[in-house]
């Protein structure tokens, strides 16, 4: 699964939503990062400890930079944007920020304000794709996607919003 683990994201764009004009994509596209952020929020542990746990569980690579620096997720976003909007993939143009700088105290403040911290990618026609750490309202569908799950929210005309959620880290999800 090159994009979004166990979610058939490419097939959804090419077949399921082919009759729509896609206007935006948003998603959690790296299960490793989502696992780390979810665990930090739920346990209060710091980044390094949760990363080590993710490596032990097989969710993170021994050299995790590609994941935790947002590069893997940005590549996936760029591929989806190219398919959705009929544009040439241009990873170099994407704005990319990972999760290394998120601290345990950030979750305390986010929760007090009614938000959840997630690594989210957003793309729209004619705009620079962005993969960055975001504050999402707790009521947001993407804010409710936890653990190793990935999610892609497709926006199109006439369909509106379609959300797909599935496993995004670990051998089973990434080999499907």
Model-derived segments and spans:
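Short beta-strand segments
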Residues: 27-30, 132, 155
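A short glycine-threonine-serine/GTX helix/turn-capping micro-motif
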Residues: 23, 61-69, 164-169
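ATP-dependent carboxylate/acyl-activation modules
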Residues: 139-176
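Structured core elements
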Residues: 24, 36, 118-119, 130, ...
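Substrate-binding/catalytic subdomain of NAD(P)-dependent oxidoreductase enzymes
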Residues: 50-144, 149-151
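A short glycine-/small-residue-rich loop at the edge of a beta-strand within enzyme catalytic domains
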Residues: 27, 41, 68, 97, ...
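Short coil/turn connectors at secondary-structure junctions
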Residues: 19-25, 126-127, 149-150, 158-161
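Rossmann-like NAD(P)H-binding beta-loop-alpha module
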Residues: 2-60, 71-72, 79
